Amino acid sequence: MKKAFITGISGQDGSYLAELLLEKGYEVHGMMRRASTFNRERIDPIFFENPTRFKGRLQLHYGDLADASSLNRILRTVKPEEIYHLGAQSHVRVSFDIPEYTADITGLGTIRILDAILETGINTKFYQASSSEMYGKVQEVPQTESTPFYPRSPYGCAKVYGFWITVNYREAYGMHASNGILFNHESPRRGESFVTRKITRTIARILAGKTKELALGNLDAKRDWGYAKDYVEAMWMMLQVPKADDYVIATNETHSIREFLDESFGLVGRDWNEYVRIDPKYFRPTEVDLLIGDPSKAMKQLGWKPKTSFKELVKIMVYEDLKMEGLDPEKLMKL
């Protein structure tokens, strides 16, 4: 039975990846920080909804990306054949408020894991979660694996470091270490501070009579949005091929926040203009340009392709947030 280790297992991507690997018969180990409260809402269903389904094949370990000794301990204990490094301080706007912490966790956390692989001597394959935010002030459209990086946030800068140190260790030590340059990917498990989930969550609260307003920043910002559940399949595929490499994972489509508002509010028959208020605090100090990824390489070499359209993604998110609010999406949505 293959063993996999996931950092950031309690996040959107980590929880979907854990489910995928468990379905494929893996023993899955995840790392969580010890804290006074635990964010386990995304992974608790795996444990409790059907406890016999995975027969104890999901285990959690205490550790921290700021603590190299904990990473060494976990790798020596687990000896995973595959490592998926998803853990990070991943909110772009917040990275301007805590740049040093972002650099430490998102940037240096990567080299701590790579060094732990070397020090423990385990034979493993490594996946690094890179980001389209590395392109920032884009140098060409669409972006490919060879497009120069020009990050526009502390988060983007930290991810550039993580990308290049992964490439460096691959070349210097012969590691099977791959970068997945993932463009924006959303789901009902997306954190509520991210704009897409903030929109769909607020729609549900509006219909439940709990709020009347949605505060947003730049409505003209454009992103290449995909479905997180599709994207974790690409992560797994990267570690199944003989040679490590770097891949753009994207839909090759771009949509504005304004379009997301049109689609999501339209599903429940509401005009978003009646609820949205522009708040300057949600504008980034430096905004990225047009992010649109070309996934041709991943499609050709891995056989991966996005399965879920933009409209389908928005529908999934609105549907699930209405359910979470105790509402009936079948009655409220234009399906």
Please annotate each region the language model reported:
Residues M1-H185, K229, L239, T308, ...:
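N-terminal Rossmann-like NAD(P)+-binding domain of SDR-like oxidoreductases, especially those catalyzing
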Residues L17, E23-K24, G30-F38, K55-Q59, ...:
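C-terminal substrate-binding subdomain of Rossmann-fold SDR/epimerase-dehydratase oxidoreductases
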